[in-house]
Amino acid sequence: MFPMVTEFMNYGQQTVRAARYIGQGFMITLSHANRLPVTIQYPYEKLITSERFRGRIHFEFDKCIACEVCVRVCPIDLPVVDWKLETDIRKKRLLNYSIDFGICIFCGNCVEYCPTNCLSMTEEYELSTYDRHELNYNQIALGRLPMSIIDDYTIRTIFNLPERKT
């Protein structure tokens, strides 16, 4: 008779323990239910990028002195700088400047080391195309400023993301 009573007691203890574990899991689920969603609906919602975001490079043709520092500091020798030496004034004249964003790793060395600050990083990160040759930007394409995300009325911008607890 005693073995049967102890089995019922063990069964009762196991049932209470299982209910407690299920309750703990349910409480964790409920605590996550009132948090803001982490996922954004990308084409319709966009995050505001930080000031230090390394997006597409903006180039100012008038400021460039064709010193080629950007080419020397680039880990993959990417910027193509074509210049002509003006013998009468003994200065280089910039003819063409281009960057292939299909190869660029967006390290920002060219922007950091440019002595005249003619290069800057923008907040533009949507560079996808169907043809990789369209990613080769010349000085005209590099000179265009991107449309600001805040000014685009077709999308909802998300300013504050919920902070993750670690």
Swiss-Prot record:
It is found in: Plastid, Chloroplast thylakoid membrane. SUPFAM superfamilies: 4Fe-4S ferredoxins. Binds 2 [4Fe-4S] clusters per subunit. It is a peripheral membrane protein. [4Fe-4S] cluster 2 binds at residues 74, 104, 107, 110. It catalyses: a plastoquinone + NADH + (n+1) H(+)(in) = a plastoquinol + NAD(+) + n H(+)(out); a plastoquinone + NADPH + (n+1) H(+)(in) = a plastoquinol + NADP(+) + n H(+)(out). One of its GO terms (molecular function) is quinone binding. Its EC number is 7.1.1.-. Its cofactor is [4Fe-4S] cluster. It holds the Pfam family Fer4. Keywords: 4Fe-4S, Chloroplast, Iron, Iron-sulfur, Membrane, Metal-binding, NAD, NADP, Plastid, Plastoquinone, Quinone, Repeat, Thylakoid, Translocase. [4Fe-4S] cluster 1 binds at residues 64, 67, 70, 114. One of its GO terms (cellular component) is chloroplast thylakoid membrane. GO terms for biological process: photosynthesis, light reaction. Belongs to the complex I 23 kDa subunit family. NDH shuttles electrons from NAD(P)H:plastoquinone, via FMN and iron-sulfur (Fe-S) centers, to quinones in the photosynthetic chain and possibly in a chloroplast respiratory chain. The immediate electron acceptor for the enzyme in this species is believed to be plastoquinone. Couples the redox reaction to proton translocation, and thus conserves the redox energy in a proton gradient. NDH is composed of at least 16 different subunits, 5 of which are encoded in the nucleus. PANTHER family: NAD(P)H-QUINONE OXIDOREDUCTASE SUBUNIT I, CHLOROPLASTIC. This is NAD(P)H-quinone oxidoreductase subunit I, chloroplastic. It comes from Parthenium hysterophorus (Santa Maria feverfew). The gene is ndhI.
